[in-house]
């Protein structure tokens, strides 16, 4: 090698090292100014979490957040996280269009969800969000109400066998109902999960979320080569085979149906009203045929994402809601009275007007999501330095939000651990900071399916309340939940059911 070239390369490398070291030191100085929890080398703040039982981890986290609120620095491995809990700081982050990228933790989902709407960033996220958004147009959601109703009627019928039999576990019933709904509305396919009972897909998705939750909580499992040496990897691999097989089968069946019926959306469908009951999958398939805006891999990733977000989160929300109604018979009866006033003893399918008139039931649902948000953590990554709460947050820092902690702020919600639907009376909502309640996140990267989820819950609950009374067996203190991706109770929720007629 020419000596001049060698010296030039040496100088370049030397300067790069100096710049990197200088920037790293500057970053450390910025972070040291932020109040933080005790941290250890390599593992960071994770040790106190790891040696606690799963059911005690959230309690410890809430104690730390309470001590340092509204802003705290902690480390997972060598990665800095800044947790924020005041609505004012949350608004700064969630409204910032430069802070819409998800943190590195979401990379752990890539083997399953790829880079779908939940995990993607940059141009891909913007393109996919634009393609998918019309799927949740008002008139399309209205067309799904009959499907919500059909599956709710099956749930009512299935629960009949539990009448008079004592305590039973509710989660599997609502989980199968949610799976039936998401498959038919989003994929255009009936899987009959409620009638056929056991669902290999539901079992696989539950095991997969357990694996990913444990991996996210343990920085030692972040490196892929270490993860592959553990039993977690083999569980992950088996589950992925089931999940991919299930979703690929749905996609192929839908493609065949479209070929046979030749029913596709085209640019001639200018009237949005014509798009009623258009499955989410059809929107993706249309986009793949329209100048190849989406590849087959894109479709697989988005279907996985929608199935996960539209099934697990809704079934968790409905389970917790029944837990609360079973603990508060007076609230349950008030919701029943509202439903009865609307239906007048009829078992008919609700209309959109009916659902819009379920004001009390909507407050009940929102209050349940306040105490038991389906997703308990959101994390964003800063790609450039920015100011937050009087501190400079350096690029590369992860910004995280504990949704239950935010929702239980006594300065915003009096008696925050008490279930009180009046928290969502119009006069209280209008006087509350808009970022004090974020069960579906907020800002430009909020949950695209939140309206879908609320309508689904209203329909299902309107059927259940017309037919049954529920009483919760679990004690109030059993409302503790695990540190997992989806809000899961420490003790599975048991109910006693009584027929109204």
Swiss-Prot record:
The keyword Amino-acid biosynthesis does not apply. Its cofactor is heme. Induction: Expressed at all life stages. CDD domains: CYP4V-like. Heme binds at residues 309, 447. It comes from the Eukaryota. Keywords: Endoplasmic reticulum, Heme, Iron, Membrane, Metal-binding, Microsome, Monooxygenase, Oxidoreductase. Its main location: endoplasmic reticulum. InterPro entries: Cyt_P450, Cyt_P450_CS, Cyt_P450_E_grp-I, Cyt_P450_sf, Cytochrome_P450_Monoox. One of its GO terms (cellular component) is endoplasmic reticulum membrane. It catalyses: an organic molecule + reduced [NADPH--hemoprotein reductase] + O2 = an alcohol + oxidized [NADPH--hemoprotein reductase] + H2O + H(+). Its EC number is 1.14.14.1. It is found in: Endoplasmic reticulum membrane; Microsome membrane. It is an enzyme of class 1 (oxidoreductase). The keyword Heme applies. GO terms for molecular function: heme binding; iron ion binding; oxidoreductase activity, acting on paired donors, with incorporation or reduction of molecular oxygen, reduced flavin or flavoprotein as one donor, and incorporation of one atom of oxygen. It is a peripheral membrane protein. Belongs to the cytochrome P450 family. This is Cytochrome P450 4c21.
């Amino acid at each position: 090698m020419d000596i001049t070239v060698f010296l030039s390369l040496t100088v370049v490398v030397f300067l790069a090292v100096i710049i990197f070291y200088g920037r790293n030191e500057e970053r450390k100085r910025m972070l040291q100014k932020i109040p933080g929890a005790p941290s250890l080398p390599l593992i960071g703040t994770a040790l106190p979490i790891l040696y606690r039982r799963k059911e005690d981890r959230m309690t410890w986290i809430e104690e730390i957040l309470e001590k340092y609120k509204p802003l705290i620095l902690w480390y997972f491995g060598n990665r800095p996280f800044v947790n924020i809990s005041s609505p004012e700081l949350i608004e700064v982050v969630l409204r910032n269009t430069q802070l819409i990228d998800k943190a590195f933790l979401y990379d752990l989902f890539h083997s399953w969800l790829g880079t779908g709407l939940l995990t993607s960033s940059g141009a891909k996220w913007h393109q996919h969000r634009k393609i998918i958004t019309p799927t949740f147009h008002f008139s399309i959601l209205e067309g799904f109400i009959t499907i919500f109703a059909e599956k709710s009627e099956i749930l009512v019928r299935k629960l009949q066998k539990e009448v008079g039999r004592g305590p039973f576990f509710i989660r599997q019933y609502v989980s199968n109902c949610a799976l039936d709904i998401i498959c038919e509305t989003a994929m255009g396919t009936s899987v009959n999960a409620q009638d056929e009972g056991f669902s290999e897909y539901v079992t696989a998705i539950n095991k997969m979320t357990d694996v990913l939750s444990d991996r996210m909580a343990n920085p030692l499992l972040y490196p892929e080569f270490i993860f592959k040496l553990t039993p977690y990897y083999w569980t992950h691999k088996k589950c992925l085979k089931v999940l991919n097989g299930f979703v690929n089968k749905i996609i192929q069946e839908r493609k065949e149906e479209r070929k046979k019926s030749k029913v596709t959306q085209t640019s001639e469908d200018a009237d949005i009203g014509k798009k009623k009951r258009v499955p989410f999958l059809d929107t993706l398939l249309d986009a793949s045929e329209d100048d190849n805006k989406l590849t087959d891999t894109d479709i697989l990733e988005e279907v996985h994402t929608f199935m996960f977000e539209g099934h697990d989160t809704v079934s968790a929300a409905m389970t917790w809601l029944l837990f609360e109604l079973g603990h508060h018979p007076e609230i349950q009866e008030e919701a029943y009275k509202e439903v009865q006033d609307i239906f007048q003893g009829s078992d008919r399918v609700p209309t959109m007007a009916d659902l819009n008139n379920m004001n009390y039931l909507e407050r009940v649902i929102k209050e349940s999501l306040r105490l038991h948000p389906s997703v308990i953590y959101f994390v964003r990554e800063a790609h450039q330095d920015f100011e937050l709460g009087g501190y400079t947050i350096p690029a590369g820092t992860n910004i995280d939000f504990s949704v239950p902690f935010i929702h239980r702020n006594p300065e915003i919600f009096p008696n925050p651990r008490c279930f009180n639907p009046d928290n969502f009376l119009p006069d209280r909502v209008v006087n509350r900071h808009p970022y004090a309640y974020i069960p579906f996140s907020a800002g430009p990267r909020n949950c695209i399916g939140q309206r879908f989820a609320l309508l689904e819950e209203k329909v299902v609950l309107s059927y259940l309340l017309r037919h049954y009374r529920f009483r919760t067996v679990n004690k109030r203190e059993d409302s503790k939940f695990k540190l997992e991706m989806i809000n899961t109770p420490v003790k599975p929720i048991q109910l006693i059911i009584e027929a109204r007629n």
